[in-house]
Amino acid sequence: MRVIRQLHTSKRLLQSLVDKQKYQATTYARPNHLVLTRGKNAILYDDVNNKEYIDFTAGIAVTALGHANPEVAEIMYKQSKKLIHSSNLYYNEECLKLSENLVEATKSFGGQYDASRVFLCNSGTEANEAALKFAKRYGILKSPSKQGIIAFQNSFHGRTMGALSVTSNPKYREPFGSLIPGVEFLNINDELTKLDQQVSSLKEKTAGLIVEPIQGEGGVFPIPLDTLVGLKKICEDHDIIVIYDEIQCGLGRSGKLWAHSYLPKEAHPDIFTTAKALGNGFPIAATVTNDKVNDILKVGDHGTTYGGNPLGSAVGNYVVNVIAEQKFLDEVNKKGEIITNRLRKLQERFPEHIKDIRGKGLMIGCDFDEAPAKIVDAARDSGLLIITAGKTTVRFVPALTIEDNLLEKGLNIFEKAVEKVYS
């Protein structure tokens, strides 16, 4: 009798929650039957339906240190009792510490060798907006005609107007009509000689170039190192600011602190952006620049109300301190190899359907011959949450702290989902 009562109670609660959708903007598609109530590292719980899920999404590569991380929770609790927000009219200790931490950790772990300044904000799209503004400011000071931005096909940089303007997918762009002018999209897969010709033809009107070292939303495509090295040289020749968008691929996700840490220093950016993992779920982001960029900025050129608040900065400091350890990064690579090895064995069984396995660290794409929606649904029905990227790719971006046994268990579910769809 108790089980029946609980079932009826759960159904009523679920229906009540679903009914409340009418109060939300219709901008998201969600499975109506799934209501997440709590989490623990790489597990999410739906207490309404009495279900639990292994989470290979990490809130879209956000909760790098796991859901409900106890240390993060403790830091938030202690800091919230001291000071949550004070604005950028005044200094606060945590903001200053995080800025120093980001710069020094970046240099120590093979990232931007001349990193020097940090602008703190709240989200990835905001960090990219700042980067675009800084690049345009630099260009305009060189020549009033140098205002344009070069971006790449298959890119995703955010949904606010500036970031959307350098995002190539028509699905995101077309509903909003005219965007910021002066954006040119190139094909990142073109030969360097062709890219050189294209950039050279745009040099008089281009302030900056923005690229993801690993394209995330576009399908998990690591950009060849030679391409990034070549692009930086081309841009330096034409005094064009180079921006690396590390919103998704940064902070340990690639197996190094930054995805551009794989590059020699001559290919390091003038600006790079980070968000997602930086707050482990708390909204905080950063735009990191060198002095070449910072020297052209003046008080009032940009700003934010909440950026660099003490609470978010305290969390960010903890996250950077944990991830910026070689032992931690080695573990990320080890877990990534577990996924890659399992997927390659699965590919051997289904070569006509699994076309490619690609990625770095714990940012891995499994590319199919068709949209993998049925696989995502089958996995979810069996207790695994996974997401897609691009049109035909399943994206694996679990918490960087996921336990090996849970990783293997989740991969077992994924294999069975593929078997169910294709056997």
Swiss-Prot record:
Q: State if Mitochondrion is listed as a keyword.
A: yes
Cofactor entry: pyridoxal 5'-phosphate
| Source domain of life | Eukaryota
Catalytic activity annotated for this protein? N(2)-acetyl-L-ornithine + 2-oxoglutarate = N-acetyl-L-glutamate 5-semialdehyde + L-glutamate
Enzyme Commission no: 2.6.1.11
Question: Gene Ontology cellular component?
Answer: mitochondrial matrix
What's in the keyword line of the UniProt record?
A: Amino-acid biosynthesis, Aminotransferase, Arginine biosynthesis, Mitochondrion, Pyridoxal phosphate, Transferase, Transit peptide
Q: What's its top-level EC category?
A: transferase
Name its cellular compartments.
Mitochondrion matrix
User: Which Pfam family, just one, is annotated for this protein?
Assistant: Aminotran_3
What pathway does the annotation place this protein in? Amino-acid biosynthesis; L-arginine biosynthesis; N(2)-acetyl-L-ornithine from L-glutamate: step 4/4
GO MF terms listed in the record are: identical protein binding; N2-acetyl-L-ornithine:2-oxoglutarate 5-aminotransferase activity; pyridoxal phosphate binding
Q: Which InterPro entries match?
A: AcOrn/SuccOrn_fam (IPR004636), Aminotrans_3 (IPR005814), Aminotrans_3_PPA_site (IPR049704), Class-III_PLP-dep_AT (IPR050103), PyrdxlP-dep_Trfase (IPR015424), PyrdxlP-dep_Trfase_major (IPR015421), PyrdxlP-dep_Trfase_small (IPR015422)
Read off the HAMAP family from this record. ArgD_aminotrans_3 (MF_01107)
The record's section on NCBIfam families has: argD, PRK01278.1
Similarity annotation: Belongs to the class-III pyridoxal-phosphate-dependent aminotransferase family.
Protein's UniProt name: Acetylornithine aminotransferase, mitochondrial
**Species whose genome carries this gene:** Kluyveromyces lactis (strain ATCC 8585 / CBS 2359 / DSM 70799 / NBRC 1267 / NRRL Y-1140 / WM37)
Q: Which gene encodes it?
A: ARG8
